[in-house]
Amino acid sequence: MDLHKQWENTETNWHKEKMELLDQFDNERKEWESQWKIMQKKIEELCREVKLWRKININESAKIIDLYHEKTIPEKVIESSPNYPDLGQSEFIRTNHKDGLRKENKREQSLVSGGNQMCKEQKATKKSKVGFLDPLATDNQKECEAWPDLRTSEEDSKSCSGALSTALEELAKVSEELCSFQEEIRKRSNHRRMKSDSFLQEMPNVTNIPHGDPMINNDQCILPISLEKEKQKNRKNLSCTNVLQSNSTKKCGIDTIDLKRNETPPVPPPRSTSRNFPSSDSEQAYERWKERLDHNSWVPHEGRSKRNYNPHFPLRQQEMSMLYPNEGKTSKDGIIFSSLVPEVKIDSKPPSNEDVGLSMWSCDIGIGAKRSPSTSWFQKTCSTPSNPKYEMVIPDHPAKSHPDLHVSNDCSSSVAESSSPLRNFSCGFERTTRNEKLAAKTDEFNRTVFRTDRNCQAIQQNHSCSKSSEDLKPCDTSSTHTGSISQSNDVSGIWKTNAHMPVPMENVPDNPTKKSTTGLVRQMQGHLSPRSYRNMLHEHDWRPSNLSGRPRSADPRSNYGVVEKLLKTYETATESALQNSKCFQDNWTKCNSDVSGGATLSQHLEMLQMEQQFQQKTAVWGGQEVKQGIDPKKITEESMSVNASHGKGFSRPARPANRRLPSRWASRSPSAPPALRRTTHNYTISLRSEALMV
């Protein structure tokens, strides 16, 4: 009650103070208005006097000039000879002009002196703002009556004009003071409100700094990007022009794709704690691997691979022939790096190189890089170019990669990189900014929701390899075949069959069991998924299907929907991780088996051991579970619980809880678990697609 009374008292006091100030303001405003009217009257009187004196001065000067003309004309006519009347007239005009100039000079001098005297008088007689004009005007009137001469009248007119200017200046000062006084009263009356308003206005607008790297390492040259300046330049280019035009993309290629990625619709990425940067151990292992490879047969390909691995500029069709001589060739060490191999997708059309859109990315598996789990939504935000006839980006073959390029184009990017016609990489371990507070919050959320601190050890790798017909799971089940592949090529990995990139016959490695692969691009992607979600899914077997069967809380504050979305997102991400890691392992074993001379068996064994050690280390650091060649007979429900339904890259939005129909689960038999059924489903699809590919 005391607070209520105090509030009422302050309100009444404020109201009284406001009324008093308003009354004071009205009184002073009336006073200023009356003074302003007096000033206006004085100014009008001065203007009339100035006009009268100007007319008088003009008339008097005209009379004097006429009298002078009358006196000088007969004298000049007498002096001029009758034989030369023109000369006499010209001399008369000259003398007349000289006399006029002298008179004008005298008049100007008198005006200047009169102005100086008037300024001195004004300085001496300046008094109050209102009453200083009355004695000035009376003095001017007396002076005008007392001095009938031309010079005094001119001085008087000058003084009147000076008084007029000073009056105008004083009027401007008075109006300024009136305005400032009004503002002062307004501020005092609204003191409390102005305090709160100014406090709210002075609150800084928090701007989110884009999470990315401002420097791009492009062929060991650092190119700084100022997004602020380039946004205005490239906004029109992004909206109006085609992305695949040659000159515009070469000039502003890096900034254009950066802006394009920023201007895509803000589809929220899934919440993750996937900011697992490679530690110093992974870097040291990678450096040892790189030094080992530097002494082998990678060095001759350095210039060409560096040229082809310029990630920011599209390659013209004239350079396609330079790309393909090394296409399909394996190195002497039998190791193929999957550095920055883009996934190529086009529509179901004949191989005419039209409507080819390079829309996905691939990160290096050699260093501890991770692929963002938001593959599905990012694939939709990438734009498909319309005219690749003139210029198109050729996906670089993994056999051409050089270990130095992994350093110059660091693939440990914290965001998923687009390889649409201009590819952009945010790179560098030490320059990547990290939001520590956000990471801590997400870790706390994950510990609370998923209880990830119970099981933090990675599941051991399973190296048992089986047949290709049982192991292969295609990345795209709706793909159509455009060429022919042998079964030995099927073992070596998954081939994307919907990309029309013809490869010459003579560029295939001379292996009698292999055929020419037309229209195929190898897809090898590494993935180090976050530790917590993988183990959480294995420990609890949480899926959207299991979660939706549990009773939903009626509390509006429950985060049931958030958890369900997270589970759906990471289910799709972990399925792609399993496929990609298995694909890499199959490719690795096939490469080691298909080596054609040049390197000893001990070198291959050493490289294989280094690869296995490196994979084990990265699995411990990032919590990755790599399943390489798992037999479907040994798959249990726990091991396959992370597999999601194969289909589109996004999940259908969930219906409200009270309207879910039981027909969604009617097709399932109650005895068989859903994970095993999903496994067999994928198995049949892989057999069918393999039959298409062979």
Swiss-Prot record:
| Region spans: Disordered | 259-286, 461-490, 643-680
Keywords from UniProt, A to Z, are: Coiled coil
The cysteines covalently paired via disulfide bonds are none
Tell me which stretches of the chain form a coiled coil. 15-51
The UniProt regions of compositional bias labelled Polar residues, in chain numbering, are: 272-283, 476-490
Q: Where is the composition biased (Low complexity)?
A: 663-677
Alphabetical list of InterPro entries matching this protein: SOGA1/2-like_CC
Checking Pfam families in the record gives: SOGA1-2-like_CC
Q: Which PANTHER family match?
A: MCG7194, ISOFORM CRA_A (PTHR15705), RIKEN CDNA 9330159F19 GENE (PTHR15705:SF1)
User: What is this protein's name?
Assistant: Uncharacterized protein KIAA0408
What is the originating organism of this protein?
Answer: Homo sapiens (Human)
**Classification lineage:** Eukaryota, Metazoa, Chordata, Craniata, Vertebrata
